[in-house]
């Protein structure tokens, strides 16, 4: 028994070392494979951004979802006219526009979100802002923002922006570059809200335009 026990003390750690090396090697290969796809402009997310859908011919290619893209355009139009994110969300909810999760589920997707009201997903200022800030709508595909430190740690961390994989003009845009840039400037200056909270004071004298 003593001999067997001493053998186990040597063999078991060795097996663990081999298994760990194998898992690390597999993890590195998977990461490398996914990065190649990202650099090739292939969309590898499970759920597509609101306003787009996966092409029937290529699941890694984004194409415009006509209905949702129309809502995205309206959100940008309202922002360009000075409305706050909260006011935009309220208007969309009042008009009965399905929030992204509800819309995706209506199309057969299992997408989930935390913004619920009476067990129903609703538009929120956070959702609106995420859309307004997302350069996916000018045709840029940005992926690889998060990672896990190694194969043993499951908790994701945000990577430095310099390490993100950005492919510009990768797919058909919904919003023009000019309108997107103006909106980013407006978002950066949303520091004063008018008394009724519906409109944001124009702090810069920017010339707003229609989409």
Per-range role (PLM):
Residues 1-209:
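Conserved catalytic breakage-reunion loop centered on the nucleophilic residue
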């Amino acid at each position: 028994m003593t001999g067997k026990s001493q053998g186990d003390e040597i063999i078991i750690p060795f097996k663990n070392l081999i298994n760990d090396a194998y898992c690390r090697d597999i993890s590195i290969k998977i990461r490398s494979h996914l990065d190649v796809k990202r650099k090739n402009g292939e969309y590898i997310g499970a759920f597509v951004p609101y306003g787009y859908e996966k092409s029937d011919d290529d699941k890694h290619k984004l194409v415009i979802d006509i209905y949702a893209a129309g809502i995205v355009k309206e959100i940008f139009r309202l922002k360009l006219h000075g409305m706050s994110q909260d006011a935009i969300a309220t208007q969309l909810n009042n008009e009965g526009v399905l929030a992204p999760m509800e819309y995706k589920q209506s199309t057969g997707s299992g997408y989930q979100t935390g913004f619920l009201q009476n067990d129903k997903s609703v538009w929120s200022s956070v959702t609106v802002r995420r859309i307004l800030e997302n350069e996916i709508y000018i045709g840029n595909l940005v992926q690889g923002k998060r990672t896990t430190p190694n194969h043993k740690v499951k908790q994701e961390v945000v990577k430095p922006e310099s390490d993100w994989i950005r492919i510009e003009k990768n797919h058909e845009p919904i919003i023009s570059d000019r309108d997107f840039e103006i909106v980013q400037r407006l978002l950066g200056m949303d520091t004063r809200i008018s008394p009724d909270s519906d409109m944001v004071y124009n702090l810069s004298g920017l010339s707003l335009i229609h989409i």
